[in-house]
UniProtKB/Swiss-Prot annotation:
InterPro entries per UniProt: DNA_Rcmb_RecR, Rcmb_RecR, Rcmb_RecR_Znf, TOPRIM_dom, TOPRIM_RecR
NCBIfam families: recR (TIGR00615)
Species in which this protein is naturally found: Pseudomonas syringae pv. syringae (strain B728a)
Protein name, entry field: Recombination protein RecR
UniProt zinc finger (C4-type) residues: 57-72
Residue intervals of the Toprim domain: 80-175
Length: 200
């Protein structure tokens, strides 16, 4: 089927979302245009406001509308623990476990084949944060249990070991090959409780 340029543009815009293919994007676009124009307008307005108003926390780099996210602005958090995650969705997943320490959000994981080295994902900024804060006694590496996530955790653990800092890895109650934001809170809480230091 051939779509007009504006409909094609809308379909292509929906396809930037993860897990949305051609058919799903077509259904979404046609649903909004045929049956829910007011919903489409609300979606466009909310998307525009979020794109303009949401940035990154200057401390942990998660998504926020303020200079500091709620976790970094909270003085009651444990300043001796730092949890390193791959993305903002992982912060929300870890928060469900009752974790009360600080965070640092990488921009993904190491993937040399995709051109993502330490600088691209923010490892130098992580090491700078650890040095500047000076209060962390344990760094919990909560990268995804994928090959790339494991490689990222090992790389960071080596840097921390060289500085005499303790690095731990969340236990693997989280399924290998899984994504943190898809794991239920109970499983993730069990994984955090069973974390172990990374031996060097």
């Amino acid at each position: 089927m051939s779509f007009s340029p504006l409909i094609r543009q809308l379909i292509d815009a929906f396809r930037v979302l993860p897990g949305v293919g051609q058919k799903t994007a077509q259904r979404m676009a046609l649903q909004l245009l045929e049956r829910d124009r007011s919903g489409g307008s609300r979606l466009a307005q909310a998307l525009g406001q979020a794109m303009d108003g949401v940035g990154h926390c200057r401390s942990c780099r998660t998504l926020t509308e303020e200079e500091l996210c709620p976790q970094c602005a909270d003085p009651r958090r444990d300043d001796t623990l730092l949890c390193v995650v791959e993305g903002p969705t992982d912060v929300y997943a870890v928060e469900q476990t009752g974790y009360r320490g600080r965070y640092f959000v990488l921009k993904g994981h190491l993937s040399p084949l995709d051109g993502l080295g330490p600088e691209a994902i923010g490892i130098p900024q992580l090491m700078e944060r650890i040095s500047q804060q000076g209060t962390f006694t344990e760094v919990i590496l909560a990268t995804n249990p994928t090959v790339e996530g494991e490689a990222t955790a090992h790389y960071i653990a080596q840097l921390l070991h060289d500085k005499g800092l303790v690095a731990s890895r969340i236990a693997h109650g989280v399924p290998l090959g899984g994504e943190l934001d898809l794991v239920d809170g109970g499983t993730l809480a069990h994984s955090f409780a069973g974390r172990k230091p990374i031996a060097m």
